[in-house]
């Protein structure tokens, strides 16, 4: 029977893969008071575990292609999880590839990196190192930034022309751990005798991925203009925000106001990104650097056509050499230090497509790249027979603890519509973002509500 004529009541009903993002099992009963999943009323999940075949899989360290750190296996994340699920095998992650190249010395001969230094030397410009200063190992590695300082020293590049724009974390790290990471960075600066921190900003602004362009604009203007409060040191910028957050729900490193670091206004102006400079964005994960990278690199026509309109960036910077640690998105006009390895053969989406079967991928905006781009091994375009649906994530709140249901109902309805269709696909992959995105806010009450919403939606689909 043709896949297009098969329905859920046919001999070959669809297989539905439901990904409850951020949903896990904590084996330590002593921590139950901090476990939103344990505290939530989840009758559907309880029934599935009690009455249907159930297993647990490990999602960290070498089981998903990540290293073993000083404190044990490095935790997985949404990108890593979706790529491993889609591949059906352990996938060596970008973090490992880059770290190995540093250990072998190949990193310091990387052609794209050397070109960034050469360009700034030729124009008399500066090299700006931009990225997440954190040991979360989800988007970046502080050790990679220190290696870039080492590379600058090895090339003999003037230390006062190596400028660091530090993005603070607070999502994959403790909420106020940023001061400690900035201190660790300062030790790296001093040991190599090169570089200085010239701006600090929370990832809420510099690493948006939901087209909240007003956030990206605040980061961009801090990087290119005399915009934002000025502080004498990076630590002072973070501590000032801890003392006076912009909103009651915006605590910690994630939300640090884009801030200038310098002795005075003249010093600040001298350290902004300008014509003829080089920028090295050292984040290795691709989804969150895309928006601000586009603001720096797209020509005027492409910038005018970005989704949801972008912002008025003024005149595009001229003769800017922008280098990304990895390929954030195909078609971006940037130099790339570490290109993706050859695509894997036999991943799930390809196997389904090659068999002449159809598939449906669905998520809200926050997780749509995960069920498409990451699930398909960094493939932007759909496979033949792959249908996609994106449900907009809420934009009327600044943090999802204010709306823990997010857009789960819309995602559920999109799946139910396909299940009821005469041409229902043979494979449905759906992501519910709530557990992860609301959990990151640190609000127990909201996280419990998020889990209960997801459980109800899964029950409707089943």
Question: Which stretches of residues belong to each language-model region?
Answer:
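Short acidic, glycine-rich surface-loop motifs adjacent to enzyme active sites
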Residues: 125-139, 425-441
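Long, well-ordered, tryptophan-enriched scaffold segments
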Residues: 173-267, 274, 278, 284-289, ...
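Active-site regions of oxyanion-processing enzymes, predominantly non-cytosolic
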Residues: 12-14, 415-436
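Metal-dependent catalytic core segments for phosphate chemistry
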Residues: 357-418, 448
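Active-site nucleophile/metal-coordination loop of metallo-enzymes that catalyze phosphate/sulfate
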Residues: 2-17, 23-128, 132-192, 196-204, ...
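Gly-rich Lys/Arg/Thr-decorated short loops/hinges at beta-loop-alpha junctions or inter-strand turns
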Residues: 85, 90-101, 129, 389-402, ...
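Short, solvent-exposed amphipathic alpha-helical segments in soluble enzyme
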Residues: 146, 295-301, 447
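A long, amphipathic alpha-helix that forms part
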Residues: 146-160, 410-420, 435-462
């Amino acid at each position: 029977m043709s896949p297009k004529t098969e329905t859920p009541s046919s001999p070959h009903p669809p297989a539905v893969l439901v990904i409850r993002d951020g949903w896990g099992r904590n084996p330590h009963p002593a921590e139950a008071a901090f476990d939103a999943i344990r505290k939530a009323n989840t009758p559907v999940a309880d029934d599935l575990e009690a009455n249907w075949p159930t297993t647990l899989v490990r999602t960290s360290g070498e089981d998903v292609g990540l290293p073993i750190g000083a404190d044990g296996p490095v935790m997985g994340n949404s990108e890593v999880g979706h790529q491993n699920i889609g591949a059906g095998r352990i996938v060596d992650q970008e973090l490992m590839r880059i770290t190995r190249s540093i250990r072998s010395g190949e990193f310091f001969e990387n052609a794209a990196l050397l070109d960034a230094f050469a360009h700034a030397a030729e124009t008399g410009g500066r090299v700006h190192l931009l990225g997440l200063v954190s040991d979360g190992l989800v988007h970046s590695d502080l050790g990679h930034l220190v290696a870039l300082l080492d590379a600058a020293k090895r090339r003999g590049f003037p230390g006062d022309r190596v400028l660091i724009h530090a993005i603070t974390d607070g999502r994959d790290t403790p909420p106020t751990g940023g001061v400690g990471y900035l201190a660790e960075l300062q030790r790296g600066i001093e040991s190599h005798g090169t570089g200085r921190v010239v701006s600090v900003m929370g990832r809420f602004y510099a690493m948006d991925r939901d087209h909240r362009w007003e956030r990206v604009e605040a980061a961009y203007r801090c990087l290119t203009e005399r915009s934002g409060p000025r502080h004498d040191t990076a630590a002072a910028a973070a501590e000032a925000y801890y003392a006076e957050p912009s909103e009651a729900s915006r605590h910690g490193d994630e939300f640090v106001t884009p801030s200038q670091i310098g002795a005075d206004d003249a010093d600040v102006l001298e350290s902004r990104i300008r014509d003829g400079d080089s920028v090295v964005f050292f984040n290795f994960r691709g989804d969150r650097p895309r928006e601000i990278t586009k603001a720096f690199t797209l020509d005027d026509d492409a910038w005018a056509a970005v989704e949801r309109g972008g912002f008025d960036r003024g005149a595009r910077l001229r003769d800017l050499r922008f280098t990304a640690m990895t390929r954030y998105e195909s078609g971006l006009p940037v130099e790339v230090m570490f290109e993706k390895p050859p695509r894997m053969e036999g991943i799930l989406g390809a196997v389904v497509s090659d068999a002449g079967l159809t598939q449906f991928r669905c998520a809200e905006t926050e997780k749509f790249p995960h069920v498409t781009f990451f699930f398909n091994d960094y493939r932007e375009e759909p496979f033949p027979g792959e249908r996609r649906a994106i449900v907009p994530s809420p934009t009327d709140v600044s943090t999802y603890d204010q709306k823990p249901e997010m857009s789960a109902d819309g995602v559920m309805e999109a799946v139910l519509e396909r299940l009821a269709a005469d041409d229902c696909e043979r494979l449905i992959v759906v992501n519910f973002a709530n557990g992860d995105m609301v959990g990151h806010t640190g609000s127990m009450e909201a996280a419990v509500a998020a889990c209960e919403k997801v459980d109800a939606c899964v029950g409707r689909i089943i």
